[in-house]
Amino acid sequence: GSAGSAAATRLSEDPQRSVLLLEAGPDYPDFETLPDELKFGYATGTDIMVSDEHNWQFTGKANEIAETMLVPRGRVTGGTSAINGQVFLRGLTDDFNDWSSEGNKLWTFEEGLPFFRDLETDMDFHDDFHGSGGPIICHRFKRDDWLPSQTAFYSACIEAGFPAVADFNQPDSHGVGAIPCNNPNGIRFSTALGYLAQARHRVNFTIKSNCLARRLLFNDLSVTGVEVESGGESFVVEGEQIVLSSGTIANAQLLMLSGIGPSDHLQEMGIDLVLDLPGVG
């Protein structure tokens, strides 16, 4: 997942920790070795969508009668941030506050704002809501650079009464305007570029690519290791602490393969139950 690169980089800042990052897909150790479809934000979507080298090629349906659609998920260091459309929008303020109201006061938008600021360098805005020294570079296309269709859409929205928005990452903004993007000079600035690049030289940090996590290993309800497959061989990786950061879909998938999830579904799939947790998946 995209967050795995950030978590591993931050954890390895402590030289007393030994950090291992397992990646199911390939890893590219420097910018020059990145394939063009990952490097450039305006590469054709076909390359990424068709190839399974960097994309899990998941599909899904919105409902029973809808047509099957692609659900692109990154299979490379940087996760889906390495193949996505580089839209750098924060979540809605009300969503964060709704989550917090369920019991965790640290999930409010106000509590999360310092982390949003820390992860970005915003090229356009320099105020209390934006960062200036973070690893991910953010910008907005100027009106002179818009396509004719974008200019026409903007003008039509203004004529229809929608307010103009200069910054969609400003809390409570709504209307029409340029979206923030993390693709300076056309480069897709993934978390692999923004975070991992600064950590690769650390002696306490190791990246192992093409290592697929098959399941988590437990001692009672404590995770002690991961069963991994690589090059047709299986082996176990153990650690004092295991951080699961496999993305929106694979996190739930790996938990269920490991026996954590709704008991009836796990039983149906022939998976031994570790913990009945209906919310998983």
Region locations from a protein language model:
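N-terminal redox-cofactor-binding region of secreted/periplasmic oxidoreductases
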Residues: 1-281
